[in-house]
Amino acid sequence: MTMDQKTDNAGKCPVAHTAPRGRSNRDWWPDQLDVQVLHRHSDLSDPMGKSFNYAEEFRKLDLDALKRDLHALMTDSQDWWPADFGHYGGLFIRMAWHSAGTYRITDGRGGAGQGQQRFAPLNSWPDNANLDKARRLLWPIKQKYGNRISWADLLILTGNVALESMGFKTFGFAGGRTDVWEPEELFWGPEGTWLGDERYSGERQLSEPLAAVQMGLIYVNPEGPNGNPDPVAAAHDIRETFARMAMNDEETVALIAGGHTFGKTHGAGDPSFIGADPEGGAIEDQGLGWKSTFGTGVGKDAITGGPEVTWSQTPTRWSNYFFENLFNFEWELSKSPAGAHQWKAKNAEASVPDAYDATRKHVPTMLTTDLSLRFDPVYEKISRRFLENPDQFADAFARAWFKLTHRDMGPKVRYLGPEVPAEDLIWQDVIPPVDHELVDDADVAGLKAKILASSLSVQELVSTAWDSASTFRGSDKRGGANGARIRLAPQKDWEVNQPAQLARVLSVLEGIQRDFNASQAGGKKISLADLIVLAGNAGVEKAARAAGQEIIVPFTPGRMDASEAQTDAASFAALEPRADGFRNYVNSSRLQFMKPEEALVDRAQLLTLTAPEMTVLVGGLRVLKAGQPEHGVFTSRPEALTNDFFVNLLDMGTQWSPVEGKEGVYEGRDRKTGAARWTGTRVDLIFGSHSQLRAFAEVYAQTDAREKFVKDFVAAWTKVMNADRFDLV
């Protein structure tokens, strides 16, 4: 049925017909800026209620009992979805891997932290075919343990137990992933079809922030790039994709080989026998998808993807067979019963067991992407080392698996449970524990006085604090003011942070810090991380006074300063903004598939802000000249925390037009005289153009809103300054 047909039926009785769906606003105006992404995962969609505290529930969990039940499940094969080789280990490893494997380092989104594999689109991605069965196998255990284990934690814990049940020693497990209750609307790519690859440009350049090679895949195409069975070309895709998942070459080899030590793939027949995915299935299927009419549709007849591959002679036990087979045999291209490209060992004896017939054996088989670990020269060197040193392989896989499954959990302070490893790992963005007495209210007042008596302006104080704190990403809980990594590479050199100004501000603040700490008895200190935030607060308070408003910005000390040794500079490079509308900054060369105003909403979502919070922050930061002050400073009183940005933006006496030769820049002129008044960007003008954002702007432009504007700005500012203070939760 076309959209027009649906509209024509709108006035008819819905009882005897399919219920009509009228055009949504997005249907009418598909290019309209979507700010609703800032209002998802609210209390209104959470059945647990505001008082529910998952950390408290998890602490009540009998983890040993839960793991015993999971161990028992591994070999409790069910007729409706039988276990390969009598053991569900391979299936559950794939489930956990694919839950975590959507993570991408560029924006920190994806990953296992919210249990999103339960929802569309992930639950229906082609690469997640039949993982709905894995989650259904887990339901009786989830039902038994209830609120004490989230789905997000259970998916990862089950992967760990699967490994342990097959003889592998894992590195550890941390709970603390809180479930969400609605799908995340993320940008997974520009494609409108499964397995499309419009995300590439030039010489196979993958657009940011994407990590997977095709729509609906977790990583790479196992048959090779776009199904081309070329192991060397596939290595290029593997390296790029895994790097965008924050994995280096050694971790990549360990993960592929370790995961493919267990289980098998499923390509028993032509994919045309497979039915709809879970989201597209019939109501009587109850959320189970990919129903197959090939043979029995399950077990030996299962079709999940295309290849039909078993890598190891002991697919339910940890071994080094993957590397032994990879190097001991030569490989010839073949096809699976489903018609997919795969490789079989030349002149090899049948030594690999059949998953369902104990009397049958098969020759070893591999995927194109497996052979990449031998035929790419860098991967080959690592693979041979693992072949010759199985203990190094086991350790590398254990560590890489832990990183894969915990990468998006943020700092270690968020980890829960008795299996949290004691070792600090650099990718955890380690921050030292507080080792000194913290400043009190009198100290704070004295420090603010010294800061305001220094040579630093309100603009410099506010900009530096915002630069430090606004790196926070609610997606993977990275960044933020804690650690004061703004003084370290690479952040100190980012264009958006105005390096020359930043160096000058930090030099002054470090002097104030030294003087204060040297004057204290008993070990009382203030960290630079705390002082940067406190200085920003002092600047905001001074700006409020200049606008006729007295207010104290809340401040809680306890941040610490990270060292260079605790900072992976290459990893932190991913936090550099492609755009930050709060500072009117755009790096157009990196801003793909997004307009600047869309990037603003994207940044606001990473900061966990609502649309009103985003609005008031932009208005306040503009008049304080934070960031890039060339455009959008709609005030004659800069560095005073007024509502002038909104008042002047909504003034009908101003007429806006694009500036010739400056894409995305507009000039506002007096509607009668033509005299120039202001210049602004798309990010500035969206608050007058977009009907919902204009409604928020009107609230703050009202004559009676001056006090509310300052209070709301301070509340949103404090939220950003404390966004990474998980120790306060």
UniProtKB/Swiss-Prot annotation:
Its cofactor is heme b. This is Catalase-peroxidase. One of its GO terms (biological process) is cellular response to hydrogen peroxide. PANTHER family: CATALASE-PEROXIDASE, HYDROPEROXIDASE I, BIFUNCTIONAL CATALASE-PEROXIDASE. It comes from Sinorhizobium medicae (strain WSM419) (Ensifer medicae). Heme b binds at H260. Formation of the three residue Trp-Tyr-Met cross-link is important for the catalase, but not the peroxidase activity of the enzyme. There is a cross-link at W97-Y219 (Tryptophyl-tyrosyl-methioninium (Trp-Tyr) (with M-245)). SUPFAM superfamilies: Heme-dependent peroxidases.
